[in-house]
């Protein structure tokens, strides 16, 4: 077993060797290196064919028509294109958007930008387990609501939203429904031929494909219109200009093909490993599971260890690559905004660790993790005056600390 152990698969995944091999065939002179928009020679045709195959592989995993897949530079761009594109196109119908407080920053900050441009955004607070209350969502819908954006799976706590039910609510009112599926694609079955979802964002690098590539699903029936955000040569049916990066697209396609083949067995395996990890640490005193194990994906476990500082815990666990909060915001010492939105106090939010498992995680690594976490928590609490006070029955929240 090699140290450190990678348990941060929700931040990014290593590229699967089968994916890397396919990508290598699209880079050099003897490979498929052409520009797919070059219609006048074989190099262009071959590149276009490689892109078509990948587009089909992605569409097949999610039950879409390949013509509904628009390539972007990643899920962040897909979220921006979906939300800004739909808001700008449909603004004559209304300027009200609904999202939730636990969305990824790519959705939240896009909505903030639209607020600066005169749109009105409602940010729903989820229930304590992270699930959106559908009654509250329905109550927030107005005559001028044009767009609802709710993620499928949360990147920090792994809870799954009922996008089928939300889709029905939106469709019956003629509201465009966008779903960020970055963390769910390849982990949960998605069938866009059945779901009433209009726009869906995908990433390559969360599913053993390369970084720098993503896609946006844009429904054809009923047809959803977007205002382009990237202008140029009119690629991707005018929705996203820019020369298509064939090697990245081929890599993403192969990653989605593998996911379709292996998803069911792999999720059973990860479910077992996640349960093994949770069962190995849940008897430690003052340990809390964040989210909802029943309504969660099998690869994410977010746990708070009360009376232990999250940063010191991460230092103690230096043989484990884990995160507190998401990678996109973890450089700041602010506690996770997702956990705060669940109504958690700052101290408990600060002591949270996200373990995310993946394709190359082994049982041996999980057992090592359990042992290391148990030892580290014990050691850090031995050093903690707060833990000592808690053990003596002092109500820490009632203490007034002196400020120097």
Curated annotation (Swiss-Prot):
Q: Which GO MF terms are attached to this record?
A: 2 iron, 2 sulfur cluster binding; cysteine desulfurase activity; metal ion binding; pyridoxal phosphate binding
Query: Which reactions does this protein catalyse?
Result: (sulfur carrier)-H + L-cysteine = (sulfur carrier)-SH + L-alanine
One matching Pfam family: Aminotran_5
The main location class comes to cytoplasm
Q: Which residues form a coiled coil?
A: none
Binding annotation for pyridoxal 5'-phosphate? 75-76, 155, 183, 203-205, 243
Annotated InterPro entries: Aminotrans_V_dom (IPR000192), Aminotrans_V_PyrdxlP_BS (IPR020578), Cys_deSase_IscS (IPR010240), Cysteine_dSase (IPR016454), PyrdxlP-dep_Trfase (IPR015424), PyrdxlP-dep_Trfase_major (IPR015421), PyrdxlP-dep_Trfase_small (IPR015422)
Q: Give the subcellular location.
A: Cytoplasm
Annotated pathway = Cofactor biosynthesis; iron-sulfur cluster biosynthesis
Q: Where is the active site?
A: 328 (cysteine persulfide intermediate)
Top-tier EC class: transferase
- Key words, A-Z: 2Fe-2S, Cytoplasm, Iron, Iron-sulfur, Metal-binding, Pyridoxal phosphate, Transferase
Residues where [2Fe-2S] cluster binds: 328
Q: Which GO terms describe its biological process?
A: [2Fe-2S] cluster assembly
Q: Which domain of life is it from?
A: Bacteria
What PROSITE patterns does the annotation carry? AA_TRANSFER_CLASS_5 (PS00595)
Enumerate the cofactors the protein uses: pyridoxal 5'-phosphate
For this record, the Gene Ontology CC terms, alphabetical, are: L-cysteine desulfurase complex
Q: What does the record give as the function of this protein?
A: Master enzyme that delivers sulfur to a number of partners involved in Fe-S cluster assembly, tRNA modification or cofactor biosynthesis. Catalyzes the removal of elemental sulfur atoms from cysteine to produce alanine. Functions as a sulfur delivery protein for Fe-S cluster synthesis onto IscU, an Fe-S scaffold assembly protein, as well as other S acceptor proteins.
- Subunit record text: Homodimer. Forms a heterotetramer with IscU, interacts with other sulfur acceptors.
NCBIfam families membership: IscS, PRK02948.1, PRK14012.1
Family recorded in the similarity comment: Belongs to the class-V pyridoxal-phosphate-dependent aminotransferase family. NifS/IscS subfamily.
Can you name this protein? Cysteine desulfurase IscS
**Organism encoding this protein:** Pectobacterium atrosepticum (strain SCRI 1043 / ATCC BAA-672) (Erwinia carotovora subsp. atroseptica)
């Amino acid at each position: 077993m090699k140290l450190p152990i990678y348990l941060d698969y929700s931040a990014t995944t290593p590229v699967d060797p089968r994916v890397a091999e396919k990508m290598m065939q699209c880079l050099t002179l003897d490979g498929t290196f052409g520009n797919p928009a070059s219609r006048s020679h074989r190099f262009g045709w071959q590149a276009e064919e490689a892109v078509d195959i990948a587009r089909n592989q992605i569409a097949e995993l999610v039950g879409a028509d390949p013509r509904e897949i628009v390539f972007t530079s990643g899920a962040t761009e897909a979220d921006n294109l979906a939300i800004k594109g739909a808001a700008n196109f449909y603004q004559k119908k209304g300027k009200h958007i609904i999202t939730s407080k636990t969305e990824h920053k790519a959705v939240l900050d896009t909505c903030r930008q639209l607020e600066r441009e005169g749109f009105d955004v409602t940010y729903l607070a989820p229930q304590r387990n992270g699930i959106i209350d559908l009654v509250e969502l329905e109550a927030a819908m107005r005559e001028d609501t044009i767009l609802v954006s709710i993620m499928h799976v949360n990147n920090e706590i792994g809870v799954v939203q009922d996008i089928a039910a939300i889709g029905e609510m939106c469709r019956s009112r003629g509201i465009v429904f966008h779903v960020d599926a970055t963390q769910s694609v390849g982990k949960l079955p998605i069938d866009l031929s059945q779901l009433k979802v209009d726009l869906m964002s995908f990433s390559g690098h969360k599913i053993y494909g390369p970084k720098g590539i993503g896609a946006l699903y844009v429904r054809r029936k009923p047809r959803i219109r977007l205002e382009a955000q990237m202008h140029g040569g009119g690629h991707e049916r005018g929705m996203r200009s820019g020369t298509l990066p064939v090697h990245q697209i081929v890599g993403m396609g192969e990653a989605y093909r593998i996911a379709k083949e292996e998803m069911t067995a792999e999720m059973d395996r990860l479910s077992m490993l996640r349960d093994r990890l949770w069962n190995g640490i849940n008897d430690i005193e003052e340990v809390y599971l964040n989210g909802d194990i029943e309504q969660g994906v099998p690869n994410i476990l977010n746990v708070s260890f009360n009376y232990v500082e999250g940063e010191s815990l991460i230092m103690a666990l230096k043989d484990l690559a884990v995160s507190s909060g998401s990678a996109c915001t973890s450089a700041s010492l602010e506690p996770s905004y997702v956990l705060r939105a669940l109504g958690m106090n700052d101290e408990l939010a600060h002591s949270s660790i996200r373990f995310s498992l993946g394709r190359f995680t082994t049982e041996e690594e999980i057992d090592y993790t359990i042992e290391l976490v148990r030892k580290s928590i014990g050691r850090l609490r031995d050093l903690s005056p707060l833990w000592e006070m808690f053990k003596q029955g002092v109500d820490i929240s009632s203490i007034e600390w002196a400020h120097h």
